[in-house]
Amino acid sequence: MTVAPITELQQEQVVTATRHCIERAGKLLQQKFTLPPVTFDLRGRAAGMYRVRQARRQIRYNPYIFGKYFTDNLANTVPHEVAHYLTDVLYGLHNVRPHGREWQAVMRVLDAEPSVTCHYDLTGVLLRRQRRFSYRCACSSHAVSAVRHNRVQRGSGSYVCRQCRTPLVFAG
């Protein structure tokens, strides 16, 4: 049975919890922080992710894992991702380790346990499937991951067959 994603009302609760975490940290640190865009488009095994793309900050949540473990994610994942955001704003991404001392200190400001990961039973949760590409060599065909395929296309990687030792060629 597939787990249903969280409802729009639950999404609003998550955004509100995210905002409250940021506001609470702002009061305690005597600094004003803005709420970055919050999306519910994350797939795979991660419940949440903070990322910066082209100088745009964003917090992403997995609606399926939140759907299965809503209360736990509200209490743990939200402050975890907010702490990444605040650590970035306060110290910069390149100056600190992802779960280093600075991040742990921000987690404590948020009254959250600075744990790195949660171990959930993901039965029924839609997991991201990596796309495979067809390649061939002198002796057989191969399914190459999207990451390796992109490396070949950019010219930054090449792969050979383990059996015949000939280069793998994209089969289209």
Residue ranges and their predicted role:
Residues 76-88:
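Active-site recognition of the HExxH zinc-binding catalytic motif
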Residues 2-72, 89-172:
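Metalloprotease/metallohydrolase-associated module, dominated by Zn2+-dependent proteases
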